[in-house]
Amino acid sequence: MTIQVQNLNCCPGRFVCVHKMTLLIILIISAAVTVIDQLYQKLPYDEQTKYIVSTITDGINATIISVMAILGLNNLNRVRYSKLDENGVYSQEMVTMNVQSDAANNKKQLKKKENEDVDEEKGLYPNLKLTEPTAPMIHNYMYDHKTQQAYLLTEHQIEQIKQNSVDPNNTPKIEVRSQF
C-alpha cells in the first residue's frame, strides 16, 4: 500500500482561514509596534525614555512571535493521509492528523518495539525481499589498455572472444586476469 500525503486547509469549507487571517493581523500589529519603536528612537527624548520604549516594544514583538509560533505550528500543519492500492485507486480511509501528534505516536510505537526482539532490517524495510547475487562466483577481468576500462567476463564470454578474434595470438592491448 502506498500512502499519499496532501496538505489541507486547516479550516475546510471556509473561503478564508481564520488562523491565517489571525497571523496576518498579528504581523500587521508587529509591524506597527516596530514603526512606533523607530519613531521614538528618532524623536528628541532622553536616553532613559528611549530605552524604556525600546524594551517594551521588544517584549511585545517577542510575545507576538510566540503567539505566531503557537498558532502556526499547531493549526497550519494539518495533512491528509490516503492509502493507494496496487492499481493506484484511493481507498476510503481518509485521516486528517496533526504532524506533531503523529510523530509522538511513532516515538511511542518505537519504544514499544525496542522492548521486543525485532529484526532491525525487517522493521525498517518490511517490503524488501532477499535477493541472490547475480554475479558469477568465478569471473575474469578484461582490461583494455587503450580505453583504460575493465570488464567483468565469464569463462563462456572469454571463450567467445578468443574464437571470434581475427588473430587470437596478437592481442597485446587486452589483459585477462582471473579472480576467485
From Swiss-Prot:
Transmembrane intervals: 16-36, 52-72
Principal place of residence: host cell
Keywords associated with the record: Host membrane, Membrane, Transmembrane, Transmembrane helix
Residue stretches in coiled coil: none
Transmembrane listed as a keyword: yes
Any one cellular-component term (Gene Ontology): membrane
Origin: domain of life: Viruses
Localization, UniProt: Host membrane
Record membrane topology: Multi-pass membrane protein
Protein name: Non-structural protein 4
Gene it is expressed from: Segment-11
